[in-house]
């Protein structure tokens, strides 16, 4: 037995059984990994707020955000992380169905974000759901979710993916998310009186997808543009300023339904610089959304998708980056 194991054993032996310290505690509020092994759980410290399990895994009863141990929490706040999610076979999570969307987010990625910003059974809302990566991710970790999208084909693809994966199919709505969320009667009906713990969105990034393809994308789509829809309400068909204003409006509409200390998490990718235009879209989004009352920017995580195909952009004349990363911008509702 090494030194670490000895320290864990000593800490566990010195702690008292959880049920002795909290005989009337609502066990349903505990993480499943404690709840399912409650007879092994112990509490330590003067305040008896730290739960310790036989393997040394700990959970603090003051944690109002999620059901993670301290060690898991540390992993999830890493500011830069890389993944290589498969796009074939069982581990692709029905990518064969979801690939009708030009940029489907991996359900495993969305699940991991949801795990940090919610507790079990809390509500996740996605107003730009696409083919449902957020909803699939929520189902994978015992959360609830609701989604909206303009494109009925994408919504149907989500339902088919959920069926194939044998995951719960959550409520979905087809329509303009800004129009739907601006209608309090309709939004109250959609949410059914529930508070939102996490608004998790991957909006179309301005008119990026409406441009002709270059580089590696040509192999998949040809040179044609691949807009998400032809609708003028689609953020993906808007110019920069119109896009930023529409994105801000989409979040403002939902703010009063987000719980205090709830989070808004937004995926954004920069455009390539052009002349004197630096095109740091993530910075512009942070500034625009930080204008919303009671919503504060808390930081970002940078996701690098190592499965993205590389292409010699600019060769042999100048540097042009292969942008395999996206910014995950994190905001919190303070009041």
Cite the ranges covered by each PLM segment.
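Class I S-adenosyl-L-methionine-dependent methyltransferase catalytic core
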Residues: 1-335
């Amino acid at each position: 037995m090494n030194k670490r194991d000895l320290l864990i054993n000593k800490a566990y032996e010195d702690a008292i059984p959880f049920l002795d310290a909290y005989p009337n505690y609502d066990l349903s509020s505990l993480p499943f990994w404690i709840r399912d092994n409650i007879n092994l759980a112990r509490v330590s410290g003067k305040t008896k707020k730290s739960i310790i399990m036989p393997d040394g895994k700990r959970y603090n009863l003051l944690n109002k955000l999620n059901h993670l141990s301290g060690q898991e929490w540390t992993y999830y706040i890493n500011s830069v992380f890389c993944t290589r999610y498969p796009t074939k076979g069982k581990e692709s999570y029905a990518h064969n169905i979801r690939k009708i969307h030009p940029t489907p987010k991996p359900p495993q990625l969305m699940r991991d974000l949801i795990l940090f910003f919610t507790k079990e059974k809390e509500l996740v809302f996605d107003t730009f759901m696409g083919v449902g990566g957020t909803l699939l991710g929520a189902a994978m970790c015992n959360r609830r979710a609701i989604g909206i999208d303009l494109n009925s084909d994408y919504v149907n693809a989500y339902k088919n993916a959920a069926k194939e994966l044998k995951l719960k199919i959550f409520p979905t709505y087809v329509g303009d998310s800004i129009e739907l969320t601006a209608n309090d009667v309709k939004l109250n009906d959609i949410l059914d009186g529930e508070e939102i713990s996490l608004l998790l969105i991957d909006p179309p990034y301005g008119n990026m997808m409406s441009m002709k393809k270059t580089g590696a994308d040509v192999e998949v789509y040809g040179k044609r543009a691949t807009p998400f829809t032809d609708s003028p309400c689609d953020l993906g068909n808007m110019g920069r300023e119109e896009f930023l204003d529409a994105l801000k409006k989409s979040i403002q509409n939902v703010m009063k339904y987000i719980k205090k200390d709830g989070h808004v998490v937004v995926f954004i990718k920069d455009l390539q610089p052009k002349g004197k235009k630096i095109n740091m879209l993530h910075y512009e989004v942070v500034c625009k959304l930080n204008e919303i009352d009671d919503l504060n920017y808390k930081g970002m995580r940078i996701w690098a998708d190592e499965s993205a195909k590389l292409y010699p952009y600019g060769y042999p004349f100048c540097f042009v980056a292969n942008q395999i990363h996206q910014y995950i911008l994190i905001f919190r509702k303070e009041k």
